[in-house]
């Protein structure tokens, strides 16, 4: 009897566990008009989402199979329309029967795209965009990230006026975070973790806070980059000493914690954007993302479209998967996609070999130089093939102790390599670049004397180690902080275009400082993020498109202060058409991701490097309505159901207004031709709005891409007043050659009038 009972219990447990395992979190998109009409006809007292969940529960429970009731995680009603829930396969089938159902997207985890820059960008205290009159305006920047360290000096509210009455946000209490943590600077803090915990399990509170408090540093860093207070005498152990400041340093900040140790759940990101728009943010900053997807299947694209409809400017990082082509994420045309580049500040080191050769490197190590020490590589192994990468447990202390170890990049993080060398008794580390990794130098907060080197120096060092007649030696010296390097230079890691889902729009849009950025950091989080690192800092130096994105978010807030009636598209246009393609020496911007650091192109930096002061007075703007964006989706041959996911309901693609994909009123031109196209042509129309001098005349200047003729009609446009809109057409003709598939050529189209030069890049690609 007991045996039968055990068998019964075991069978029940197995059946129940299978039912649980069958569950998955889905983001459900609904047609707002249809679903409300459908459920209200049944019970007008019940919320629409409750009616949907009840229908699924009742239908599934009436079947012969055991089903656990669906679990509702979020309801989305502002930036998109739908909900997130845990459903079984059967329940998903029942949901598909409901009139108004559009799509179900499985939830997934996305990743983070992991001072002096205001000066480098030309912002000056008391002048221009940083004038008292401009900074007096209230702008609220919402930051979706790993949370925030509210007590940091960068987020104190001294001198700020009371919180705007329009603000509807909240300060949610949680672990080590009370509602009193917010103030007139940090006006809101919310947590979104339901999707993450369904995917990765309950948050480990020994490693993270189950609240808006930041345990990783990333969110604190990005928030202060966008809008942190101006803090004098900030530095990283004396490096980069100066005033640390956000781009719009007296903006309010609202922190939305959506990212945890293992990533950021799409369902949580959607909920945060939905809530942020309802709360009343003016700008959204997202330094996170995944691979590019069709817009109807991209949660950030969908929610950002809804935010744009409400007048919210959305800035996103392009990603850190460069320099390979078509790696950029967050590429929807209504999103400002930001690449990363260097400023002219560096943290140089000097590596001297035993043969007298000297190489320049980079590091944030703040200690004494090493003496000339034995240099080892590969032969430091315990028999493990990964010893050249200095992975955990791969180094033999007997072979490493007291020596400098050369380590290849890859497999583990750069600071983890240094930690492994130190734990094995090594006295220093030289981080080697492969040929593919180029001349990119990383300044990292190493726990021992260490430096990174470019590929050419790395190649020489490998040869020296293998072929030196004497035992190889090296020393590392640390030279502090220097200024005046050629800049900007595109970072090799910055993700590139062309867009894999919308090649008719150039992506990324612009580049901004994203390498070696000094910004706020939680004092309980080590600068290297290593457990063995017991150092505490208030400011850390970090690199990534995660760092460039909040620069643009803060600059957009500055522009919004000057032009309160401008749409997100107009602000975006101003930032793009005034961006610079030249460095501080007057030469074209170079690219660390290309062979021999050749000149960067629009697939690396979009329209160029942001220029805040010029963007505040662009002369002309290319404006785009949400209807224009929807017609653009029509031109991509999206179905009505796919478009409805973004429009939140029925939208009919009218033939007469349907755009050619490249005909969106975008501030750049992406042109596609077949490889064997000869004399093939395409004509795009653009409309520009005068926001400069009331009475003004512009003449066009064209730099033609190789292999293409460009004709503009008319070649002169004349405005009578501010707000006037005039159109022009551009015809591109591919002539007389058979191109290689995937090859591109570049040019530009600029409208010139006095001090104004409204520039649009041209990218022609042969498919």
Language model regions located:
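Loop-rich non-cytosolic ectodomains and luminal regions
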Residues: 2-767
């Amino acid at each position: 009897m007991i045996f039968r009972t055990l068998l019964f219990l075991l069978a029940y447990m197995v059946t129940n566990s299978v039912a649980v395992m069958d569950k998955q979190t889905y983001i459900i998109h609904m047609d707002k008009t249809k679903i409300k009409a459908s459920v209200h006809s049944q019970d007008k007292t019940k919320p629409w989402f409750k009616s949907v969940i009840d229908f699924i529960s009742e239908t599934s429970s009436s079947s012969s199979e055991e089903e656990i009731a669906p679990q509702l995680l979020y309801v989305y009603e502002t930036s998109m329309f739908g909900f997130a829930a845990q459903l079984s396969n059967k329940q998903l089938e029942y949901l598909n029967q409901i009139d108004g159902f559009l799509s179900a997207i499985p939830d997934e985890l996305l990743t983070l795209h992991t001072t002096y820059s205001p000066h480098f960008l030309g912002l000056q205290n008391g002048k221009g965009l940083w004038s008292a009159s401009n900074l007096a305006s209230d702008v609220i920047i919402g930051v979706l990230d790993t949370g925030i360290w509210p007590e940091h000096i960068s987020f104190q509210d001294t001198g700020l006026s009371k919180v705007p009455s329009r603000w509807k946000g909240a300060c949610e209490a949680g672990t080590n975070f009370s509602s009193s943590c917010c103030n007139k600077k940090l006006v809101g803090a919310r947590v979104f973790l339901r999707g993450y915990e369904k995917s990765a399990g309950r948050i480990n509170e020994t490693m993270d806070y189950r609240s808006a408090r930041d345990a990783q540093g990333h969110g604190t860093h990005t928030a202060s980059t966008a809008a942190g207070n101006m803090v004098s005498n900030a530095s990283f152990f004396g490096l980069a000493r100066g005033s640390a400041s956000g781009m719009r340093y007296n903006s309010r900040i609202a922190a939305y914690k959506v990212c945890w140790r293992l990533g950021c759940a799409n369902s949580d990101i959607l909920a945060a954007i939905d809530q942020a728009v309802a709360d009343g943010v003016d700008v959204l900053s997202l330094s996170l993302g995944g691979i590019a997807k069709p817009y109807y299947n991209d949660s950030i694209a969908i929610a950002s479209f809804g935010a744009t409809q409400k007048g919210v400017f959305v800035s996103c990082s392009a990603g850190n998967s460069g320099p390979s082509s078509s790696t950029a994420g967050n590429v929807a045309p209504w999103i400002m996609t930001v690449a990363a580049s260097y400023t002219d500040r560096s943290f140089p080191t000097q590596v001297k070999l035993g043969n007298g050769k000297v190489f320049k490197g980079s590091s944030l190590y703040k200690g004494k130089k090493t003496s000339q020490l034995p240099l080892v590589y590969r032969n430091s192994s315990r028999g493990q093939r990964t010893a050249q990468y200095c992975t955990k447990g791969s180094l033999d202390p007997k072979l490493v102790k007291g020596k400098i170890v050369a380590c290849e990049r890859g497999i583990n993080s750069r600071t983890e390599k240094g930690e492994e060398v130190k734990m094995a008794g090594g006295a220093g580390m030289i981080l080697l670049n492969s040929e593919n990794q180029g001349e990119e130098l990383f300044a990292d907060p190493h726990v021992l004397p260490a430096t990174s080197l470019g590929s050419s120096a790395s190649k020489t060092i490998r040869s020296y180690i293998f072929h030196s007649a004497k035992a190889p030696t090296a020393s590392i010296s640390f030279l502090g902080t220097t200024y005046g390097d050629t800049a900007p230079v595109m970072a090799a890691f910055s993700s590139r275009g062309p867009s894999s889902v919308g090649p008719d729009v150039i992506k990324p849009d612009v580049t901004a400082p994203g390498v070696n950025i000094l910004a706020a950091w939680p004092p309980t989080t080590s600068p290297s993020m290593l457990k063995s690192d017991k150092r505490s800092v208030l400011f850390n130096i970090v690199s990534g498109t995660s760092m460039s994105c909040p620069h643009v978010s803060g600059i957009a807030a500055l522009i919004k202060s000057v032009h309160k009636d401008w749409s997100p598209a107009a602000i975006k246009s101003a930032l793009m058409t005034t961006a610079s393609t030249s460095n501080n020496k007057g030469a074209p911007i170079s690219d660390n991701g290309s062979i021999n650091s050749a000149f960067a192109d629009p697939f690396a930096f979009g329209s160029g490097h942001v220029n805040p002061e010029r963007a505040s007075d662009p002369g002309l703007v290319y404006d785009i309505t949400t209807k224009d964006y929807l017609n653009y989706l029509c031109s991509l041959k999206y179905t009505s159901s796919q478009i409805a996911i973004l429009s939140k309901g029925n939208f009919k693609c009218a033939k007469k207004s349907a755009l050619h994909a490249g005909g969106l009123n975008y501030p750049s031109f992406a042109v596609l031709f077949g490889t064997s196209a000869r004399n093939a042509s395409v004509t795009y129309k653009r409309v520009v709005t005068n926001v400069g001098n009331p009475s003004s005349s512009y003449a066009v200047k064209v730099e033609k891409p190789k292999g293409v003729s460009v004709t503009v009609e008319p070649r002169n446009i004349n405005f009578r007043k501010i707000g006037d809109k005039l159109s022009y057409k551009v015809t591109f003709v591919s002539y007389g050659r058979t191109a290689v598939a995937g090859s591109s050529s570049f040019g530009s189209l600029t409208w010139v009038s006095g001090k104004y030069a409204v520039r649009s890049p041209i990218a022609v690609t042969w498919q």
